[in-house]
Amino acid sequence: MRLIRMLLATALTFSVIPAHADGKDVARLTQLLEKSQTLTARFSQLTLDGGGTQLQETTGEMALQRPGLFNWHTDAPQEQLMVSDGKKVSLWDPDLEQVTIKKLDQRLTQTPALLLSGDVSKISESFDITAKEAGGVIDFMLKPKTKDTLFDSLRLSFRNGIINDMQLIDSVGQRTNILFTGVKANESIAASKFQFQIPKGADVIQE
């Protein structure tokens, strides 16, 4: 559930391009994000406390489509599902047989998943952005411009122009690392993937 809440809420020496904050970094990140209108992938997520102790490890699969559609399915160790139809988000917990439905917060600082599936044309209004490149991997560090956020910093890493991993660090130093594998971009995704059907007999909570 921590991954879902946070998303609502990612020895060798190389020649490194120093981090710098300018319009080129913003434009490059925006271009990389916007060129993938859909994404599907497996993910593995690891959460560590401020001292580096492992708190949680989960795996699953995700599907994203612009603007604002996503399906984030955690399959182990505990199944959970988060689905956005662009207007509302449904959180399904099979163990509790409970669905929580809430309005989708369009602010990128409150819903990190929208960085991969939403409108990022005004990303510089929400974040200070710096970039560095090493060994064919481009890292973008995003620092929220306001304090009313779910995280203190977010790193997005791209390999060969495709999202490879992301890391979120919260106010107490906990790190959530998400690695994507088998990434496929700009392939057709069934509309039903982003429409959550409430299971019969499930408890429904509207927020």
Swiss-Prot record:
Kindly list the places in or outside the cell where this protein is found, as annotated in its UniProt entry. Answer: Periplasm
Provide one Gene Ontology cellular component.
outer membrane-bounded periplasmic space
> Main localisation, per the record?
periplasm
The record's listing under Pfam families reads: LolA (PF03548)
What domain of life?
Answer: Bacteria
- Swiss-Prot/TrEMBL keywords: Chaperone, Periplasm, Protein transport, Signal, Transport
Q: What is known about its subunit structure?
A: Monomer.
Family stated for the protein in its record: Belongs to the LolA family.
Kindly provide the name given to this protein in its UniProt entry.
Outer-membrane lipoprotein carrier protein
Origin species, per record, is Pseudomonas syringae pv. tomato (strain ATCC BAA-871 / DC3000)
